[in-house]
């Protein structure tokens, strides 16, 4: 019965769904979601992003589409296309707020209802990947998201951390959450992993080193890679530019493209 419902829904044309999780805020989860979408697009894939970080919807600004409006069609909400080729589509509560600075001051049941509505009522059309950018932590919103997506058999989750022990500790709780909810862990990404000097290419570990990789080994899950601090990446996000296209020689580019390739490989293995 679940499979019949999934085929007839707005997610029926989506081949692979993956969630991006983090144990705490400020680790760059939305940055990884954004750059993963761009990397997959440059691999020839059609990508959707569902931003369910209801209290901190930052992805519309990262694509410089924060002033766009969401329209209705017979099938539901039409997502916002972030590029002329319409290869990346985005849905976020940021498009539904009257003012950009409005705060979402809602209790759990109202948030959970909107998440379920996002899953059911966005007309995505045909997509190769749908990336679901979640709030930090483990809460009712995460449970609602996983339960709403379960009929569509998500590919799995990417966990984002930074090298510090406090962030790595929070990701351990995310691993437990994934285990309890039956969500497959595709791997761990360590973000802000050192700063590579643009002049001499020497890497300085500003925080600490290797926490994400060590956790992945301990938990028995793949380590997808370390993404260094990169001023060009920050600049591209501030200006809504395509980092993957414009900065192929930057220090973060190889790590981000390797992460995307591993996701593509995992999706191919699942399909075969």
From Swiss-Prot:
Residues that bind [4Fe-4S] cluster: 197, 200
GO terms (BP aspect): iron-sulfur cluster assembly
Gene Ontology terms: cellular component: cytosol; nucleoplasm; spindle pole centrosome
Major localization class: cytoplasm
Record SUPFAM superfamilies: P-loop containing nucleoside triphosphate hydrolases
Cofactor: [4Fe-4S] cluster
Cross-referenced CDD domains: Mrp_NBP35
Subcellular location(s) of the protein: Cytoplasm
Keywords from the named record: 4Fe-4S, ATP-binding, Cytoplasm, Iron, Iron-sulfur, Metal-binding, Nucleotide-binding
Cofactor note: Binds 4 [4Fe-4S] clusters per heterotetramer. Contains two stable clusters in the N-termini of NUBP1 and two labile, bridging clusters between subunits of the NUBP1-NUBP2 heterotetramer.
GO molecular function terms noted in the UniProt entry: 4 iron, 4 sulfur cluster binding; ATP binding; ATP-dependent FeS chaperone activity; iron-sulfur cluster binding; metal ion binding
Residues the record lists as binding ATP: 23-30
Function: Component of the cytosolic iron-sulfur (Fe/S) protein assembly (CIA) machinery. Required for maturation of extramitochondrial Fe-S proteins. The NUBP1-NUBP2 heterotetramer forms a Fe-S scaffold complex, mediating the de novo assembly of an Fe-S cluster and its transfer to target apoproteins.
HAMAP family noted in UniProt: Mrp_NBP35, NUBP2
Subunit structure and binding partners: Heterotetramer of 2 NUBP1 and 2 NUBP2 chains.
Family: Belongs to the Mrp/NBP35 ATP-binding proteins family. NUBP2/CFD1 subfamily.
Name of this protein: Cytosolic Fe-S cluster assembly factor NUBP2
UniProt organism field: Gallus gallus (Chicken)
């Amino acid at each position: 019965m679940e499979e019949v419902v999934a085929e007839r829904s707005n997610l029926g044309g989506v081949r692979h769904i993956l969630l991006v999780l983090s144990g705490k805020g400020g680790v760059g989860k939305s940055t990884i979601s954004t750059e993963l979408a761009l990397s997959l697009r440059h691999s020839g894939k059609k990508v959707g992003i569902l931003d369910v970080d209801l209290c901190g919807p930052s992805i519309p600004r990262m694509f410089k589409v924060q002033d766009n409006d969401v329209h209705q069609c017979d099938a539901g909400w039409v997502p916002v296309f972030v590029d002329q080729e319409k290869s990346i589509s985005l849905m976020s509560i940021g498009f539904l707020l009257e003012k950009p600075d409005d705060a979402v001051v809602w209790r759990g049941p109202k948030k959970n209802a909107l998440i379920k509505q996002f899953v059911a009522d966005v007309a995505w059309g045909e997509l190769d990947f749908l990336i679901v950018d979640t709030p930090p932590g483990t809460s009712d919103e995460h449970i609602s998201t996983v339960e709403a997506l379960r009929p569509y058999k998500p590919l799995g989750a990417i966990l984002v951390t930074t090298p510090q022990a406090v962030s790595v500790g929070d990701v351990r709780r995310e691993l437990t959450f994934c285990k309890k909810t039956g969500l497959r862990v595709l791997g761990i990404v360590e973000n802000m992993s050192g700063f590579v000097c643009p002049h001499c290419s020497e890497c300085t570990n500003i925080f600490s080193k290797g926490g994400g990789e060590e956790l992945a080994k301990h938990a028995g899950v793949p380590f997808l890679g370390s993404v260094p601090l990169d001023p060009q990446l920050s600049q591209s996000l501030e200006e809504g530019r395509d980092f993957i296209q414009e900065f192929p020689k930057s220090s973060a580019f190889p790590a981000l493209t390797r992460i995307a390739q591993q996701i593509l490989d995992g999706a191919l293995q699942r399909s075969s």
